């Protein structure tokens, strides 16, 4: 099933399993890659559902405030983001006890333990 969205935001576009591969957000709160305007900052200056990736307008994989960007590794998608200088890098651990995948080693050492799925982070 093709994910043909209208120009405006369409949260029901990816409601079917056939279209899930075109989704950039969780089911029920998703945006379609076929509708870039719905996940990127609009030309008029209005804010859209974008990640905190240095203002690049990368599409979110999760709801605003708890999103990872498309350019992040797939294993890190659909998780909260760490406070790594506002880079929007995906967390490998729960909020408050997390290390970012692209953070310096010293920043990862600040956490005592976490369930990092094979990333080797602290």
Swiss-Prot record:
GO cellular component: cell cortex
Region Spacer B2: start-end pairs: 73-81
Gene name for this UniProt entry: CMT1
Stretches the record annotates as Cys-rich copper-binding 2: 51-72
Subcellular location: Cytoplasm, Cell cortex
Keywords: Copper, Cytoplasm, Metal-binding, Metal-thiolate cluster, Repeat
Region annotation Cys-rich copper-binding 1: where it falls in the sequence: 1-35
Top-level division of the source organism's lineage: Eukaryota
Gene Ontology MF annotations: metal ion binding
Region (Cys-rich copper-binding 3): 82-103
Induction of the gene: Expression is induced in a dose-dependent manner in response to high concentrations of copper and basal transcription is repressed in the presence of the copper chelator bathocuproin sulphonate (BCS). Expression is regulated by the CUF1 copper-dependent transcription factor. Highly induced during mice pulmonary infection.
Segments for region (Spacer B1): 36-50
Domain-related comment: Divided into 4 Cys-rich domains by 3 spacer sequences termed B1-B3. Each cystein-rich domain contains the conserved copper-binding motif Cys-X-Cys-X6-Cys-X-Cys-X4-Cys-X-Cys-X2-Cys. The copper-binding domains together are able to chelate up to 16 copper ions.
Region (Cys-rich copper-binding 4): 114-122
Function according to Swiss-Prot or TrEMBL: Copper metallothionein that protects the cell against copper toxicity by tightly chelating copper ions. Required for antioxidant-mediated growth rescue in the presence of fluconazole. Acts as a critical factors for lung colonization and virulence.
Lineage of producing organism: Eukaryota, Fungi, Dikarya, Basidiomycota, Agaricomycotina
Family: Belongs to the metallothionein superfamily.
Main location per the UniProt record: cytoplasm
Region of interest called Spacer B3, as start-end residue ranges on this chain: 104-113
Record-given protein name: Copper metallothionein 1
Deletion consequences: Fungi lacking both CMT1 and CMT2 show attenuated virulence and reduced pulmonary colonization in mice. Impairs growth rescue by antioxidants when cells are treated with fluconazole.
């Amino acid at each position: 099933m093709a994910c043909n969205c209208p120009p405006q935001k369409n949260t029901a576009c990816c409601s079917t399993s056939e279209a899930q591969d075109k989704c950039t957000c969780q089911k029920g709160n998703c945006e379609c890659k076929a509708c870039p305007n719905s996940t990127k900052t609009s030309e008029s200056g209005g804010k859209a559902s974008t990640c905190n990736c240095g203002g690049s307008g990368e599409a979110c994989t999760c709801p605003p405030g708890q999103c990872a960007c498309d350019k992040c590794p797939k294993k890190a998608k659909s998780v909260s983001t760490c406070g790594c200088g506002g880079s929007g890098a995906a967390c490998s651990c729960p909020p408050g006890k997390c290390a970012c995948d692209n953070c310096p080693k010293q920043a990862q050492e600040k956490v005592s333990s976490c369930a990092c799925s094979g990333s080797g982070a602290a």
